[in-house]
C-alpha cells in the first residue's frame, strides 16, 4: 500500500487530496501532518512554490511516507492586479519531484489592502465577509464566487496534475 503524506491538517486540503485520489482511482493511505513551510505567513509569488515544496519535503522526512505532498496558497502582483492561487508540490521518497498550479483569480482591492497590511488572505476574507476561519471551509474563492468554486475544488485539479507522473511511474511503469 502506498502512503501519501500531506503537509497540513487543514480539512480542505485533506478533503481535496482524498477527492483527487478518488478521481485517480488510487487506494492509497493518506495522512495529514502539520509541518513548517519555511515562508511568511502569507506567501507572495515565488514563496508559494518554496512553501509547497518545503511542506512536501518536511512531511516526507517526518513520516517516511512514499510520497510527500505540499499545498501552499499564495498571492502575487501580476500586471498590477493581485491574484491568488495555490501550488501543489509532490516528492517521492526516491526523489522524483513535480508540481502544479491551481487556477488564479484576482482579488478585490479591499482584500489586497488588508493583505498588504500584514493579514493572511484567509484573515482578510473573514474580515470582509464577516466569517470565521474560511480557510478551513470555502476559502476566499468560495466567498468571492458564492461557492460556485470553493477552495477544495480549486485544489483537486492541481493535486491530480502534480501526481500524474508519479502515478504513471508507480502504476504503469511509464517514466517521467
UniProtKB/Swiss-Prot annotation:
It catalyses: XTP + H2O = XDP + phosphate + H(+); ITP + H2O = IDP + phosphate + H(+). Pfam families: NTPase_I-T. Binds 1 divalent metal cation per subunit; can use either Mg(2+) or Mn(2+). The lineage of its organism: Archaea, Thermoproteota, Thermoprotei, Sulfolobales, Sulfolobaceae. Mg(2+) binds at residue 36. GO terms for molecular function: ITPase activity; metal ion binding; nucleotide binding; ribonucleoside triphosphate phosphatase activity. GO terms for biological process: nucleotide metabolic process; thiamine metabolic process. Homodimer. It comes from Saccharolobus islandicus (strain M.14.25 / Kamchatka #1) (Sulfolobus islandicus). Keywords: Hydrolase, Magnesium, Manganese, Metal-binding, Nucleotide metabolism, Nucleotide-binding. Gene3D superfamilies: 3.90.950.10. PANTHER family: NON-CANONICAL PURINE NTP PHOSPHATASE_PRRC1 DOMAIN-CONTAINING PROTEIN (PTHR34699:SF2), PTHR34699. Belongs to the YjjX NTPase family. The keyword Metal-binding applies. This is Probable inosine/xanthosine triphosphatase. Its EC number is 3.6.1.73. Phosphatase that hydrolyzes non-canonical purine nucleotides such as XTP and ITP to their respective diphosphate derivatives. Probably excludes non-canonical purines from DNA/RNA precursor pool, thus preventing their incorporation into DNA/RNA and avoiding chromosomal lesions. Its cofactor is Mg(2+); Mn(2+).
